[in-house]
Amino acid sequence: MKLLRFGKNGNEKPGIELEGKWLDCSAFGEDWSEEFFENNGLERLEKWLETNVHKLQEINKKTRLASPIKRPSKIICVGLNYSLHAKESGMPLPEVPILFMKATSSLCGPYDPILIPKNSTKTDWEVELAVVIGKKASYIGKENAMDYVAGYCLHNDVSERDFQLHHGGQWVKGKSADHFAPLGPYLVTKDEIINPHNLRLWLKVNGQMMQDSNTSDLVFDIPTLVSYISQYMTLLPGDVISTGTPSGVGLGLKPPRYLSHGDEVELGIDGLGVAKQKAYDYDKV
């Protein structure tokens, strides 16, 4: 299944994508939230659709898409998880996953604008594969970690490099501004992705290809990440793990290049859809 959410900010409704159409699932009576995943929501939704899908109203594709999941308890990001990205950042390849949090208030829809923060000079892009947790996970082993995964999303881990690297490194500070976590368009359930470790991911700025790689280049794979993180915190249903970005970010270019007011970002991952975001100065929206 491909889950989506749609509607004006603060009044989003649940839906699905089916055969190229967006369908309103409001009649199901639940949003795609922690409670939904916690209570076997995907299985219940699939069963409900068997007898109700023909009744669902089609959504006009001019409608705003929101994040495909309701605000989760956590957005956990993994740093330097592609070897060439570590090299372009001038940092050694990590021996264990580098973890940091991204404020959930940064979450937004896949076509919402990127807001360049006040006093920002180095707002950057990062295409990433995001993993959505399907059930509570604590101290789990790598061998069964995939049992805890609900599905996958496309994520732009927007970053402000000056904020991030200031005073020796404050990653959460450089990752958590408003609209710094465009997610979606869809949550694609794991049964639809045959091999999440062989997906092309790419990103363009103003039509120019900046990132073009494959998840086969991940330093730490998804089972390793899910298991590792669960040793240090409880993962709740709906939590997002963003698995890192490949090379081609603005920071690594010579000279570096960053987003300016009016720039357009387009990104995609095989099977997960395409997103587009336009950058705006914070005080010009």
Label every model-predicted segment:
Residues M1-P97, E266:
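N-terminal non-catalytic cap/leader segment that marks the start of a structured domain
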Residues P92-P110, T123-W125, S260-G271:
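Structural signature of FAD isoalloxazine-binding scaffolds in flavoprotein oxidoreductases
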Residues G20-K21, S105, Q208, L272:
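Well-ordered beta-strand scaffold positions
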Residues P113-N119, K135-I140, H166-Q170, G184-K190:
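Glycine-rich, charged/polar anion/phosphate-binding loops
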